[in-house]
Amino acid sequence: MKITVRLLCLRLLLAVCNVSGADDVNKPANTTILMVDDHHILYRSGTVRKLKPLKRFSDKPVIAADKLWETTVAYCSVYKNPESGKYQLWYQAWPGRSGCYMCYAESDDGINWIKPELGLLTFNGSSKNNILFKNGYGASVIFDKNDPDPDKRYKSAFWEQDLIKGLKYPGMSIAYSPDGIHWEKHPKNPLIKGSYGDYIQPPLANDLKQQGAQGKPVSVSDVIDLIWDQNRQVYAVYAKTWLDGPKGDMHWKRAVVRTESKNFIDWTKPRLIIWPDEFDSINDLAETDRTAGGGGSDGVQLHSGPAFYYNDLYFSMLQVMDSGGTGNMPIELALSRDGYSWKR
């Protein structure tokens, strides 16, 4: 009788698992199951999920804007080179109105950084600087161990709008490097036209000559995060985009799109994946006064969504921009099982 009852209970448990769509609860013994959401959990009554906030290392930045070409610094990528043991870091430096630069630093411990004098580019008559190339706005870098071409071991995706080189449209561009220092840009850049059609960033809503190109279709904009998606076996970019408002207001809200590529050259149409919702003051009126040098509207927006894949889950450190409130950009955790459908 006891055996019969046990078999009945086992069959009922298997039936519940199948009905709930939780077949993947049965993972191999050597697989780590993450409990950051309820995907693998059938029942958890009486439990509380607590996420431990990240702790900032110190009050001082580890990469300070302390060079002549560094009025501000932003948008970095980090990689630990297994051969040298050094951390490599690529970041954007903004000297002012003369455009931006992609710069390089390295470290033995990830805390104390050196900006080597590379001698690759001249700034104010001197090549004693750590500048890699010009106009790599929002550049993101990955190390690609699978590419058979050693000259393309490092890959970068970035926003470029170089009038000097005669680019017709700003947009997402790419570059290759054998060592992370010496870079070659793709001759057909930009590979994806940006989400607005001219070099003004962004144009005013009353600029009639621009209205045909605003966010239609949704495309990439000037914040780009590149990853190798090991789950889907593709290169993927999570980028900022601009959404038009419900009343036709241009550049109403910032949101996040994803595009991917098998060969790093041919990219899919950017797809909108994360956008402001009813909890983000989405009904705020558009702000068209951009005299301060930046675009956007009041209220909460999603400035960018850098992501990575770990075990069977995508994580995004979503940058939430509150331009009309505190002016801060807090980080929110977002989760996805496929890289496209996200929960915040």
Task: Label the model's feature ranges.
Residues 7-16:
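Bacterial N-terminal signal peptides
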Residues 304:
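Structured ligand/cofactor/substrate-binding pocket environments in proteins
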Residues 1-6:
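Positively charged n-region of N-terminal signal peptides that target proteins for export
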Residues 18-21:
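Sec/Tat signal peptide C-region and signal peptidase I cleavage site
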Residues 23-299, 308-344:
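Beta-rich carbohydrate-recognition and catalytic domains
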